[in-house]
Amino acid sequence: MHLVYMGQSAKTENGASDPNDPFEVVAGLMLHETQVTSVNGEFDALCRRHFGSSLGEDGTPQMLRPLDIFEGLEHYSSWTPEKRSQMIQDCLDILIRREAPVLSAFLNNQTFAEARTNAASPAALLWNEPIDPVMSRFLFALSMYLDEMNMATLNHDQIMSGAFPVSQFAMVLAQEGASIQQQMMTDFLRSDEGVDSTGLHENICVVNAQDSPAMQLANLCAFFTLRWLQTPENPNPFFEALRDNKVIQVLYPVSL
């Protein structure tokens, strides 16, 4: 079973969508269930190295918030840019060493608002918030990615016979208080595109990001994807490191 931790680019305290963000971005970090323990261990060791103790203990933040680290806010106000950059890179290296795949989908929020206002796209009227079409497209991309993984495991006899046994499965995990809801999965699996997505677990599991190192790493991926979308003409070394080292596998621009 693959666990897909849904990072979001939102800057709000509880992870909910921020209306001031120009893009709605989700980043699904896919880890096999056998990898989670080692990721947690590396993450805790990293935090002890940078903070002197684990997250949540005296003198340390409760969790890693990408905006705070990147801009030197809150706990990081006294840190030098070099120290903050090193911590970010150390976090990303946990994923880079494993080539842990990240699948991202994004939508320009202004495009969404204009499509609904002008009724330029009938499909836009089916969605209430930008996260709705973004998650629909993300789940489609995840389903296709699982299909590719399943195809890669087929032997010659299975291919010749047309057999397509499903051996790769994925469960989506959303962070508590965020805008990803169970109904999004239910609607996708009932749609024409999702009806054959036999590798997707039908339930979305909700976790507290403070208790999930993988979710915090997924949020970092979403944050730096957002920064790349905002200023694609500028150097974005953290995003480029993820992309060039085969972590970011899918970048799905959602259209309406």
Predicted segment positions?
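Phosphate-ester processing/binding pockets and catalytic centers
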Residues: 1-256
